Curated annotation (Swiss-Prot):
EC number of the protein: 2.1.1.170
Residues that bind S-adenosyl-L-methionine: G73, I126, E127, R142
Protein purpose: Specifically methylates the N7 position of guanine in position 527 of 16S rRNA.
Subcellular location field: Cytoplasm
Reaction equations catalysed: guanosine(527) in 16S rRNA + S-adenosyl-L-methionine = N(7)-methylguanosine(527) in 16S rRNA + S-adenosyl-L-homocysteine
Sequence similarity: Belongs to the methyltransferase superfamily. RNA methyltransferase RsmG family.
Protein name from the UniProt record: Ribosomal RNA small subunit methyltransferase G
Membrane spanning stretches: none
GO cellular component: a single term: cytosol
Gene: rsmG
Domain of life, source organism: Bacteria
Phylogenetic placement of the source organism: Bacteria, Pseudomonadati, Pseudomonadota, Alphaproteobacteria, Hyphomicrobiales
Keywords: Cytoplasm, Methyltransferase, rRNA processing, S-adenosyl-L-methionine, Transferase
Coiled coil: none
Length: 211
Protein backbone atom coordinates (compact mmCIF):
# COMPACT_ATOMS: atom_id res chain seq x y z
CA UNK A 1 0.00 0.00 0.00
CA UNK A 2 1.22 3.49 -0.78
CA UNK A 3 1.31 5.65 2.34
CA UNK A 4 1.16 8.73 0.12
CA UNK A 5 -2.01 7.46 -1.55
CA UNK A 6 -3.65 6.76 1.80
CA UNK A 7 -2.76 10.25 3.01
CA UNK A 8 -4.11 11.85 -0.15
CA UNK A 9 -7.43 9.96 0.03
CA UNK A 10 -7.93 10.86 3.69
CA UNK A 11 -7.14 14.52 2.97
CA UNK A 12 -9.34 14.81 -0.12
CA UNK A 13 -12.33 13.39 1.73
CA UNK A 14 -11.71 15.30 4.98
CA UNK A 15 -11.54 12.11 7.02
CA UNK A 16 -11.11 12.52 10.78
CA UNK A 17 -8.37 10.77 12.74
CA UNK A 18 -10.93 8.44 14.33
CA UNK A 19 -12.46 7.51 10.98
CA UNK A 20 -9.01 6.98 9.48
CA UNK A 21 -8.26 4.49 12.26
CA UNK A 22 -11.50 2.64 11.48
CA UNK A 23 -10.67 2.53 7.77
CA UNK A 24 -7.19 1.21 8.59
CA UNK A 25 -8.82 -1.57 10.61
CA UNK A 26 -11.17 -2.31 7.70
CA UNK A 27 -8.20 -2.61 5.32
CA UNK A 28 -6.41 -4.91 7.77
CA UNK A 29 -9.51 -7.10 8.05
CA UNK A 30 -9.97 -7.18 4.28
CA UNK A 31 -6.35 -8.19 3.79
CA UNK A 32 -6.59 -10.95 6.41
CA UNK A 33 -9.87 -12.40 5.16
CA UNK A 34 -8.82 -12.13 1.52
CA UNK A 35 -6.33 -14.97 2.02
CA UNK A 36 -9.15 -17.46 2.63
CA UNK A 37 -12.36 -15.85 1.30
CA UNK A 38 -11.30 -14.08 -1.93
CA UNK A 39 -13.49 -11.06 -1.20
CA UNK A 40 -12.07 -8.74 -3.88
CA UNK A 41 -9.91 -9.05 -6.97
CA UNK A 42 -6.42 -9.89 -5.64
CA UNK A 43 -4.71 -7.21 -7.72
CA UNK A 44 -6.94 -4.48 -6.28
CA UNK A 45 -5.59 -4.94 -2.75
CA UNK A 46 -2.40 -3.16 -3.80
CA UNK A 47 -4.52 -0.11 -4.66
CA UNK A 48 -7.13 -0.54 -1.94
CA UNK A 49 -7.18 3.13 -0.95
CA UNK A 50 -7.87 4.26 -4.51
CA UNK A 51 -9.84 1.34 -5.97
CA UNK A 52 -12.08 0.71 -2.97
CA UNK A 53 -11.88 3.34 -0.22
CA UNK A 54 -11.87 6.49 -2.37
CA UNK A 55 -14.30 4.93 -4.84
CA UNK A 56 -16.79 4.40 -2.02
CA UNK A 57 -16.23 7.70 -0.21
CA UNK A 58 -17.08 9.76 -3.28
CA UNK A 59 -20.73 8.70 -2.91
CA UNK A 60 -21.00 10.66 0.33
CA UNK A 61 -20.17 13.89 -1.48
CA UNK A 62 -23.10 13.28 -3.84
CA UNK A 63 -25.62 12.83 -1.02
CA UNK A 64 -24.03 14.54 1.99
CA UNK A 65 -27.25 14.98 3.97
CA UNK A 66 -28.53 11.40 3.66
CA UNK A 67 -28.31 9.20 6.76
CA UNK A 68 -30.29 6.08 5.77
CA UNK A 69 -28.34 4.08 3.18
CA UNK A 70 -28.82 0.64 1.65
CA UNK A 71 -26.07 -1.30 -0.14
CA UNK A 72 -27.15 -4.23 -2.31
CA UNK A 73 -24.80 -7.14 -2.93
CA UNK A 74 -22.45 -5.65 -0.39
CA UNK A 75 -19.79 -8.37 -0.71
CA UNK A 76 -16.66 -7.02 0.94
CA UNK A 77 -18.53 -3.97 2.19
CA UNK A 78 -17.85 -1.83 -0.84
CA UNK A 79 -19.26 0.74 -0.78
CA UNK A 80 -21.67 0.17 2.14
CA UNK A 81 -19.38 -0.71 5.04
CA UNK A 82 -16.88 1.98 4.03
CA UNK A 83 -19.71 4.53 3.92
CA UNK A 84 -20.80 3.45 7.39
CA UNK A 85 -17.31 3.96 8.77
CA UNK A 86 -17.10 7.40 7.18
CA UNK A 87 -20.51 8.41 8.51
CA UNK A 88 -20.53 6.84 11.96
CA UNK A 89 -19.74 10.13 13.72
CA UNK A 90 -22.93 11.65 12.29
CA UNK A 91 -26.11 11.30 14.39
CA UNK A 92 -28.52 8.73 12.97
CA UNK A 93 -26.24 7.53 10.19
CA UNK A 94 -26.92 3.88 9.35
CA UNK A 95 -26.26 1.55 6.42
CA UNK A 96 -28.07 -1.71 5.72
CA UNK A 97 -25.98 -4.28 3.89
CA UNK A 98 -27.75 -6.96 1.84
CA UNK A 99 -25.62 -9.96 0.88
CA UNK A 100 -26.76 -13.51 0.06
CA UNK A 101 -23.35 -15.15 0.57
CA UNK A 102 -23.03 -16.32 4.18
CA UNK A 103 -19.23 -16.23 4.18
CA UNK A 104 -19.20 -12.62 3.04
CA UNK A 105 -21.82 -11.79 5.67
CA UNK A 106 -19.50 -13.27 8.29
CA UNK A 107 -16.79 -10.86 7.16
CA UNK A 108 -19.21 -7.93 7.21
CA UNK A 109 -20.53 -8.75 10.68
CA UNK A 110 -17.11 -9.34 12.20
CA UNK A 111 -15.60 -6.20 10.69
CA UNK A 112 -18.60 -4.12 11.76
CA UNK A 113 -18.21 -5.44 15.31
CA UNK A 114 -14.50 -4.56 15.42
CA UNK A 115 -14.92 -1.10 13.91
CA UNK A 116 -18.21 -0.08 15.49
CA UNK A 117 -19.71 0.55 12.06
CA UNK A 118 -23.42 1.51 12.21
CA UNK A 119 -24.73 -1.26 9.95
CA UNK A 120 -27.33 -4.00 9.82
CA UNK A 121 -26.28 -7.07 7.84
CA UNK A 122 -29.05 -8.89 5.98
CA UNK A 123 -27.98 -12.38 4.89
CA UNK A 124 -30.70 -12.65 2.25
CA UNK A 125 -31.53 -12.33 -1.40
CA UNK A 126 -32.44 -8.83 -2.51
CA UNK A 127 -35.94 -9.82 -3.61
CA UNK A 128 -36.69 -11.23 -0.16
CA UNK A 129 -36.01 -8.04 1.80
CA UNK A 130 -36.26 -5.05 -0.53
CA UNK A 131 -39.94 -4.46 0.21
CA UNK A 132 -39.20 -4.03 3.93
CA UNK A 133 -36.57 -1.32 3.40
CA UNK A 134 -38.66 1.45 1.85
CA UNK A 135 -37.54 4.08 4.38
CA UNK A 136 -34.15 4.15 2.63
CA UNK A 137 -32.89 7.53 1.43
CA UNK A 138 -30.07 6.26 -0.80
CA UNK A 139 -29.72 2.81 -2.35
CA UNK A 140 -26.41 1.86 -3.96
CA UNK A 141 -24.79 -1.17 -5.57
CA UNK A 142 -21.37 -1.57 -7.12
CA UNK A 143 -20.37 -4.21 -9.69
CA UNK A 144 -23.54 -6.20 -9.05
CA UNK A 145 -25.75 -6.25 -12.17
CA UNK A 146 -26.73 -4.26 -15.28
CA UNK A 147 -28.67 -1.08 -14.58
CA UNK A 148 -31.95 -2.53 -15.87
CA UNK A 149 -31.74 -5.33 -13.30
CA UNK A 150 -30.81 -2.91 -10.51
CA UNK A 151 -33.90 -0.85 -11.34
CA UNK A 152 -36.08 -3.97 -11.26
CA UNK A 153 -34.77 -4.91 -7.82
CA UNK A 154 -35.10 -1.39 -6.42
CA UNK A 155 -38.46 -0.51 -7.96
CA UNK A 156 -40.23 -0.54 -4.55
CA UNK A 157 -37.77 2.12 -3.36
CA UNK A 158 -37.21 4.28 -6.43
CA UNK A 159 -40.95 4.67 -6.94
CA UNK A 160 -41.31 5.89 -3.34
CA UNK A 161 -38.79 8.72 -3.09
CA UNK A 162 -35.49 6.87 -2.67
CA UNK A 163 -32.51 7.94 -4.79
CA UNK A 164 -30.32 5.35 -6.50
CA UNK A 165 -26.54 5.82 -6.82
CA UNK A 166 -25.05 3.15 -9.05
CA UNK A 167 -21.32 3.28 -9.93
CA UNK A 168 -20.78 2.10 -13.50
CA UNK A 169 -17.82 1.70 -15.81
CA UNK A 170 -17.31 2.66 -19.43
CA UNK A 171 -20.58 0.94 -20.44
CA UNK A 172 -22.74 3.31 -18.37
CA UNK A 173 -24.30 4.99 -21.42
CA UNK A 174 -25.12 1.64 -23.02
CA UNK A 175 -26.72 0.36 -19.82
CA UNK A 176 -28.79 3.54 -19.60
CA UNK A 177 -30.07 3.10 -23.14
CA UNK A 178 -31.06 -0.49 -22.44
CA UNK A 179 -32.77 0.44 -19.18
CA UNK A 180 -34.81 3.15 -20.89
CA UNK A 181 -36.50 0.46 -22.98
CA UNK A 182 -38.23 -0.74 -19.80
CA UNK A 183 -38.18 2.22 -17.43
CA UNK A 184 -38.86 5.94 -17.25
CA UNK A 185 -36.73 7.82 -14.73
CA UNK A 186 -34.85 11.01 -13.99
CA UNK A 187 -31.12 10.44 -14.17
CA UNK A 188 -27.74 12.12 -14.00
CA UNK A 189 -24.37 10.78 -15.10
CA UNK A 190 -21.83 11.96 -12.54
CA UNK A 191 -18.13 11.61 -13.44
CA UNK A 192 -16.23 9.30 -11.12
CA UNK A 193 -13.38 10.85 -9.15
CA UNK A 194 -11.39 7.60 -9.26
CA UNK A 195 -11.74 6.55 -12.93
CA UNK A 196 -12.03 8.98 -15.83
CA UNK A 197 -14.03 6.45 -17.86
CA UNK A 198 -16.48 5.59 -15.07
CA UNK A 199 -19.73 7.27 -14.11
CA UNK A 200 -22.08 7.21 -11.15
CA UNK A 201 -25.67 6.92 -12.35
CA UNK A 202 -28.07 8.83 -10.11
CA UNK A 203 -31.68 7.70 -10.53
CA UNK A 204 -34.93 9.13 -9.14
CA UNK A 205 -38.64 9.09 -10.00
CA UNK A 206 -38.76 5.58 -11.47
CA UNK A 207 -41.75 4.13 -13.30
CA UNK A 208 -42.27 1.35 -15.81
CA UNK A 209 -42.66 2.10 -19.49
CA UNK A 210 -46.24 1.51 -20.57
CA UNK A 211 -46.49 -1.70 -22.65
Amino acid sequence: MSTDLRTRVLSEHHVSRETAASLDLYVAQLTRWQTVKNLVGPATLKEVWHRHIADALQLLSIAPEATRWLDLGSGAGIPGLILALAGKERPGFHVRLVESNARKCAFLSETARLTGAPVTVHNARIEAVIGTLTDTEIVCARALAPLSQLLAWTEPLLTSGTTGLFPKGRDAATELTEAEDEWTFTRDLIPSRTDSQARIVRVTSLSRVDP
